[in-house]
Structures are given as C-alpha cells and as structure tokens.
Curated annotation (Swiss-Prot):
SS bond partners: C73-C103, C156-C180, C236-C294
EC number, as in UniProt: 3.1.1.-
GO biological process terms on file: lipid metabolic process
The protein's name in its UniProt record: Esterase
Amino acid sequence: MSSAMRKTTNSPVVRRLTAAAVALGSCLALAGPAGSAGAAPADPVPTVFFGDSYTANFGIAPVTNQDSERGWCFQAKENYPAVATRSLADKGITLDVQADVSCGGALIHHFWEKQELPFGAGELPPQQDALKQDTQLTVGSLGGNTLGFNRILKQCSDELRKPSLLPGDPVDGDEPAAKCGEFFGTGDGKQWLDDQFERVGAELEELLDRIGYFAPDAKRVLVGYPRLVPEDTTKCLTAAPGQTQLPFADIPQDALPVLDQIQKRLNDAMKKAAADGGADFVDLYAGTGANTACDGADRGIGGLLEDSQLELLGTKIPWYAHPNDKGRDIQAKQVADKIEEILNR
C-alpha cells in the first residue's frame, strides 16, 4: 500500500480501480462452474472487523491487549464481533477473523490514516492495513465520531462540559447547554451539522471504495448505531433501576428529540452510503427502539453518566451512551443475521 493511497481522500483512482476489480470479479464468476445457490460457505471466511467504540464495545470489561497501546482502544474481549463470530460458528458458519481493528475514538479517516491514542499513548496504523487480498468479509461501524457526536452531547450538557468528563469540546462553548435544541434546530449549530454531514457522506464513500480496492472480493457490511433516545422522551425523566442519574443526565428534555433526529439523520446517511456503494447495511437504529437508554430494565444503552464496567486509575468510567451487555447482544444478533444472509446468497 502506498502512502499516497493511504492518505488521499475522495480519490477517483480508488473508485475507478474498484469498479474495474468488481467488473473483473463478475466476469470470472460468470465464467466459473456453477455452485449450489443459497449454501453457506464450507471453508472459513477470511474476515476483518473495523470501527469505533461501538464496534469495540467501549464500557464492557475486560478489554483486549490491556498491557499494550491497543488497550487504549477499550476494545472488549466480548465485543459484538466476538459474540457474532461464535453465534455463526454454532450455525456451521466459520469466520476466519484476520483482524479486529476497532478502536474507541476512531474517525472515518482513521481507516486510511494513523490514529493518535489518548494521553500520548502512541498511534495505531490505518485500519485498512488489516485488509488482505484474500479478505472475503468486512464488517464495522464508523461515522459517529466524524459527525462529532461527543461534541453534540457536550453542547447539550453542563455536566459533560466539566474537564474530567468526555474528551472534546462543545460545538460552541459560549452557547448555553440549556438552549442546545434551539442551537442545532435553527441556530448556528444547524449549518455546522450540515457541514459535518457532508463530510461524513464523502468519507463513508471513500471508506467503501478503499475496501473494494484493497480487498476486491470482500463483502462490505456497514453497521449502523443503536438508537439512543426513544420516541417517547418522557421515559427519560425516570432513572433506570438502581441508578440515581437520569439516562441523559442534565440534557434538557426538549433537546432529546433533536438528538434523536440527528442520530436518525446519521443512520440515513450511512444507509445511503452503503446503498450507493453496493454494500450491505445493518439498520440497528430501526431495530432497537425498545432498548434505548431510557427503557429502564430493558435498556441496551448505558446511561450517559451511568458507571460502565471499566475503571481508569481506580475510578469507574461512565458508559457515555454506549451499548451494555444487552445492547451488545442485540448488535451481535443483528450483525450475525446479516452475515448469514449475505453468505447464503
């Protein structure tokens, strides 16, 4: 892989080469011997998982590579890629996992650029470096950090603006958190969001192009994000069993529908990118409306300031609205179902 290919975004050459590779693969498939339709592959399927903290399943302990720089990815040993892989094996579908390079904090461009780890812990190579010519399946989520969802949450919460909580800055620290719904709905935040979504769309296109170039035979599966805020936001006015904080802490209730609209827009952008790029999409948003952060005992999302399973220097780290064990299992089932569907085509 050349450094130019790693670092150039929106590269037309990647798209042209991808199209050529796909066309060649189609011709070879047509010329090859007929196989049995709908049969799962007999051989292990070389697979690469990629993504951010929602693929790594930040918040679930223990984490992998705890004693190395990759420990700062907070990738759970039992993340949804691991659980989905086992579930498929129980059905006779074996994934040969070449790598799981999912890492908390990853932006879309970290697929082709190095990722700086927090606290000066080092840097990781581009996630695309895990791809091989024989990779047959790629699965993962990227987009939330590029959109700046942590900054959006900070814009809406005085608690999250405290220095010890959630890295990053609010979109506009001069605007009060209490008015964040107005800020994103009709204020300066509206244009900021439009610009962010334009970037997300372009970079998701680049991501899928790159997978097609570096792993030309790979099925590409883009996984959306589970729904955080329910349709009925009055549920968010009650703390979950055993909790004292509300699921979204001090975020105003009138801002919660705005946050949900932003997440729905991200989901739609990811779905469109997958469709336009000829990839498959796992619509977790559509399938998790009964398991949001505000669904009490049924919640699949840990509350914003609810203690997760992780500790840092003896202090519990909050979930920051990431999937808990239940949510991880929902992710794993829907991803495994999609992989089974794809491999049985």
